[in-house]
Amino acid sequence: MSIFLTESDRVIVQGMTGSEGRKHTRRMLCAGTKVVAGVNPRKAGATVVFDVAPLGPGAEALGVRPGTVEVPVHGAVAEAGRATGAAVSAIFVPPAFAREAIIEAVDAGMRLIVVITEGIPVADAVYAHAYAAERGARIIGPNCPGVISPTRSNVGITPPDITGSGPVGLVSKSGTLTYQLMHELRDLGFTTCVGIGGDPVVGTSHIDALAAFEADPDTELVVMIGEIGGDAEERAAAYIRSSMTKPVVAYVAGFTAPEGRTMGHAGAIVSGSSGTARAKKAALEAAGAHVGRTPSETAALARDAHRKVVGAAERA
């Protein structure tokens, strides 16, 4: 199985006609994602033609063949949803328009909204997340790589050809570290990889993903990537202690970060002793998680945890 996303989900792309939207829509199509429409009020009625070829494991099984795919452009999300039956949206619009794009997707009945856009004002993000939560829609992001279930579907910008399917669940604040751990653990493979984003306000938390992986029968262990700043990792540690039965392996980026300086993401900032990588590592280890000091060490810990899971299953 997978979490949040299945191979049958139909996807629309808000901002598909822009350069980034067009580039990543093509990659999603090449991975086998069912992208069925784009949305741009100024280009309603147009059709965008994509050159596609299978990319990543499972693409051919999902029906991807070398050739072209035509994707229609609608003027509104509601119109696109009615015409295609889509319930998932990927958002590639500029930051100033992101709040209204999210609200439009929620009002149109999108159950999953993946917001790739970086630089959305915090007040806009707070409003949009509250609006979606009140209406039962899930936002992943903003400022995230999206969500991929290898050999099933891929919504966002995650490269589909760096890993395959397997028993590991991955939740991460960092896009590049998501890709690195996916590559380092390609021998095991993943049920789903969720990039939640590194902004101060995100729609899906570590805890949300941990709970979904705990409930997923095909996920045998979880790799969690955090970073300095805030208390998301400490809250995740409390959840791991109280609710996780599956092993959790973690990595916290930022052990050498200087105090008071934002490091990469808007939310990655240390203030005094609060939000340090060492404090987060200690909290996670106290909760029973195994924490690596580097991505490669984290991958090794994950392999060891998986061997123990397999050994326990064989002895049962």
Descriptions of predicted regions:
Residues 1-316:
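Catalytic-core regions of core metabolic enzymes
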